[in-house]
Amino acid sequence: NELDLENTTINVASEINKCGLNTKLLGRKETAIFLKYSFSRNFDEREIKEIEDNRLIAWVKPKKVEFRANSYTVDGTQAAVFAIADYPLRVRNAWGADVFNIPNTKVVLHVKPVDKFKAIKRIDKCIGEMETKQILSEKASEANSAETHRETMNALLDSLQTENESLLDVTLTITAYNYLDDDNYKKAVRRSIMTGNFKPSNLYGLQIEGFKSSAISPVSTLKNYERGINSSSLAAVFPFVRTFVMDDGGIMLGEN
C-alpha cells in the first residue's frame, strides 16, 4: 500500500545518504517529467504547469509508437533498442560508466536476485560446460577463453559458498535516439558499446520486447539476455562518474 511504499522510499533514501549521495523525493509533477523523459526528450517541461494531476498519466504516455523489425518511432523520433548479449570476462572499476555516458541514449539496468541454491547449481553446470569446451575446442583462442571463464566461475563459486557474495540476473538495454537526423545513429552507438568489449544485440524482431524492458519499471521481457553477475562486480558498475578531468591543466592526485 501507499504507506509501505513511502516507508520503503524513506529507508532507501537513508541508505543512499550513508554513501555520501544526496537524495530528493520527487513530487507528482517532477515524477511525471522524469517518466516522460524515459520515452523521449522532445517535449517542453513547461507544459506540465497547465496539466491537472488526473491527466498526468495521459501526458506521460507517448502519443504514437510505431515498431519495425530493428527500430521504432516514438512521437516522430526514430529510436532503436540494443541489449547486451555478452559481457567482458574481466572489468575495471566503473565498468559501466562509458556505456551509460553514450550521447543520445537511454540506458536501463534491470537487476533481479537469484536464490543461492539455484545460483550454485547454475555455476556448477557452467563450470562443467567450460571444461568440456576447453577440451574439445580446436582453436587456442576459444580454449583460452573457456579456461578464463572456468577460473572466474570457480572463484565465484568459492565466494558464494564461503563469503557474503550473491548472484543477480542482469539485463542491460541501450536505447539509441536519432535526435540529430543521422542515418548512422545506430552504428555510432553500437561502435561505442563494442569499444568496452560488450557484445550488443540489435534485437531484430524483438523491438517491442526491448521497448518494454527499457521502460522505467520492474518488467523485463528479454529473458534470453539475462546474465548472472556477482554482487561485488555489479557494485563496481558506478555509472554516475565522469570519465575525464574537469579542469584545464588539472593535476591528477591518484588512482585506484
Feature names for model-found ranges:
Residues 1-238:
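Extended, folded cores of ATP/NTP-driven motor/assembly subunits in large transport
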Residues 248-256:
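Glycine-rich phosphate-binding loop of nucleotide-binding enzymes
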